[in-house]
Amino acid sequence: MRAIAGTSERARLTLALAAGKGSGAAGRLLNIGGGTSFPGAIARRIDPLVLQKVAAASKGRKAVISGSNGKTTTCRMLAALAQANGISVAQNRAGSNLLKGVTSVAVREADLRGRMDAQLILLEIDEAIVRRAAPEVAPDMILVTNIFRDQLDRFGELYSLARMLETAVEALPAHASVVLNGDDALVASLAPSAPARRLYFGLRAGGVGAQVPEHAADTIRCVRCQHPLAYRRVYMSHLGDYECPGCGSRRPDLDVAITCVHASPDGGTDVTAETPAGTVQMHVPLPGLYNVYNAAAALAAAFTLGTLEPANARHALGGLRPAFGRLEEISAGDRLAVLSFVKNPTSYNATLRQILQRPGRKHVLAAHSNTAVDGEDFAWLWDVDLEQLVPDLASLVVSGTRAEEVALRMKYAGFTDMRVIPGRQDALDTALAQTPPGQPLYILAGYTPMREFRRIMQRRGWVPPFWEE
């Protein structure tokens, strides 16, 4: 490193990019990784300013997507909307969203002079590091999807997470934009005096949602005065049309609003959205109301970035498939594995609702661990409405380092006939054996078990490496 210290800034950047590109190619060749984070780590070791330099030298517009849930899918939707209009996109498509992963996008896409040719540089960034990463990227736009309980040992309580996001938003200059979920009271209140232009998205649709928040909802008190919020309509968890009886604060006027939602025969959703660019009719080929929110976020971001053409949006998402681990359907021999990444009560409950809408009794493999990546505080599992699953449950295998706690939670939910198998490969094989041919096995997994299951499936030839999708 002493020799590198005396190297000119331009040569240091070129060396960092070359080393990063080489490490990514080697990893893919040896099948030990897809170059989604290691190239960024190598490049940053040589030149800590590599991301900042590449971002500054690139002419494309730069967008950052952050928040608790929906980042990866929203990014893919926004990329599809841009590409439908002939706009080239560079993104961390595999969802590697820490600094190493974000830097790996720059390493992969830039030439050795440090310039990216893409017209839109689209970066999903973890909510805990966005305040550090955003200044390096200098984005034209930051979008915040939502704030839910997620890894409380890592983030602290919800307001700590909000402050992390707020720091990034406050640093945006006046010519930039911030796109916020207006249906999330905590997100909508972020950095009210920030100079950046503000746009809000959300739902304004009848026929969906409820009148009161579900019992595991996170933010149901006013951010200003802490009075319990009153809801005209709740669409998901604590997201909805709210007003505070105490101080009168309410949901902001929505710039992009989903006004009509209809289930489609393919399991997706047909939506109508009102936007400043006009009415948009669009088919969302992914299930669930949470994907309607992701679509609203993508539309708002596309308008903000100048990449929204209502006429092209209708079929822009037609080729979209679930991101890996998002109700991802995988052919596992003569059975179907449905892999779902669940990490907090909201994502878990939303996934369970989707599973329960499908016919037949359910065969389930639930796997959770408590590594630093997964989050060491697992108490949130007790707020998941697992009771709704029990009447339809045909078989259950639990796995991971927290298998015993999952088993205990299921016993309290009323289901005791389960297998506890800590090892992931044995658990997968047992769960598949308990699933009749032609029927689906639903895999509900935290981050580390999900990656482990996919590695097993990759070795068996059931899925390609995630970086090739």
Where do the model's predicted regions map?
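Short polybasic/polar patches that bind polyanions
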Residues: 42, 83, 278, 303, ...
